[in-house]
Amino acid sequence: MEFTPALQPARLIQRYKRFLADVVTPQGETLTLHCPNTGAMTGCATPGDTVWYSTSSVATRKYPHTWELTQTRDGALICVNTLRANTVVKEALQAQRLPALAGYESLKSEVKYGAERSRIDFMLQASDKVNCYIEVKSVTLSEQDSGYFPDAVTARGQKHLRELMSVVEQGDRAVLLFAVLHSAITQVAPARHIDERYAELLSEAQRKGVEVLAWKASLSASEITLTSPLPVRL
């Protein structure tokens, strides 16, 4: 996906109330950005880091600027806007750039499914294949070049794993796709030290036939694109 116009830089002062962040631009102007990330954002919101923000053309928005990327002091780029994960995955699926998920005829988004009343991020369909259900998770937590999910205990994420296991049991295909939105990450693992139950369910899901994939994005102030697969260590 392209950022049009390109993102603008600023220096982070603080993130607060989960949804807001104050920054100062290179010209010395203080702005309040909308923060589209309700997670812990560990390592992504250190005061003094460079942030990159977009600006909406909608004049009625109370906070027209949105925090998109963080550039850490060691140079790593991180996409903190969790909505971008589904956007870049959808583009990759439509362009048939993910070999394990290519060859389908149609792509649907936000399809209702499951006993726990979930919505799957994407469903792929083809006349000669079983339906393929894809749940996307954004990975931004990095520790020693490893990416971890989740960054906080997630009952919702646990529910999604149970639903994916049910998909396999009914004879369809289920995929958990980690979209890695941190330039320093070289492999992905469940954050057992944060949410042990999620890690246990993920291992169980893989044993029962849920496919677990990770793809890393190339990040810049002008574009985000999924470019390369990464190993997943369970």
UniProtKB/Swiss-Prot annotation:
NCBIfam families assigned to the protein according to its UniProt record, in alphabetical order: sfsA
InterPro entries referenced in this protein's UniProt entry, alphabetically: SfsA (IPR005224), SfsA_C (IPR040452), SfsA_N (IPR041465)
Similarity comment: Belongs to the SfsA family.
Stored Pfam families: SfsA, SfsA_N
Protein name: Sugar fermentation stimulation protein homolog
Superkingdom: Bacteria
GO molecular function: DNA binding
Source species of the chain: Cronobacter sakazakii (strain ATCC BAA-894)
Listed transmembrane segments: none
